[in-house]
Amino acid sequence: MPSFDKPTDQQEATRDAQGADSRAATEVALFEAFGGVRGMVETTVPGLVFVAIYTVKRDIHIAAIAALGLSLLLGIARLVRKDTLKHAFSGVFGVAFGAVFAMMSGDAKNFYLPGMLYTLGLAVGYIVSALAGYPLMGLILGPVFKENLSWRTRNPGRKVAYTKASWAWGLILLAKSAVLFPLYWWGDVTQLGWVKVALGIPPMLLSVYLTWIFLSKAPPPIDVFAEMEAAERAEREREATAR
């Protein structure tokens, strides 16, 4: 009869340690990819400044310039701290685009339109990529985990997790868009601005949390860079032996 030995305490401890390491690595990778809580705050605060100043002053130019100036200061602070450049510049460019669009059009609501269109496009991208078998979350996080596209063919459990995460991001961002666009069309700028600020951090936190849940339960990533380095070392050793 086959033996069904229970795992030893040492084996269970090893598995628990491996699981904890995997969860910690996933958490670090997610914070690196999405800028952490600080990145979420930085994308929300300029919009808060814009709607607050516009509510009081009713001046598009003052509100837009103030929001852009704050975004620039936040970007410079990231550069001084030697943080990732993509987080330093992405927020600045987004706010600058919205500020210019609002001032040129003369409609304060257009300050938020570029970001809303980006959110909607991102939602569609997540959903379409998941349906196509190339989940966008895998394309984003694969290089961070040093697995590149190995999850598509060699690690099906990771592909399932990335697909679930992409669906989560897509549906959450789609729901956010379903709230904001009616306000853009039929509400006033104050309503749109405050609701957009309120919907800035919670949906992203929920999306990141669900992604963490899916990936922490998935198999560990295959480090393709380590594999290539090992293959190169083996090749050098064979050449040295041949000499």
Task: Annotate each PLM feature.
Residues M1-G35, E232-R233:
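Short, Lys/Arg-rich, polar N-terminal cytosolic tail immediately upstream
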Residues A17-E32, V45-V56, L72-K82, A161:
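Short juxtamembrane and helix-loop transition motifs at transmembrane-helix boundaries
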Residues G47-T55, L72-I76, A99-M103, V124-I127, ...:
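Alpha-helical transmembrane segments of multipass membrane proteins
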Residues I53-G69, A88:
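Structural signature of hydrophobic alpha-helical transmembrane segments
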Residues V80-T84, M104-Y112, V189-T190:
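Membrane-interface helix caps and helix-loop-helix hairpins in membrane proteins
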Residues L85-A96, Y112-T119:
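Cytoplasmic-side transmembrane-helix entry/capping segments in multi-pass membrane proteins
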Residues K109-V160:
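Membrane-proximal helix-loop-helix units in multi-pass membrane proteins
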Residues F145-R243:
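C-terminal membrane-adjacent module
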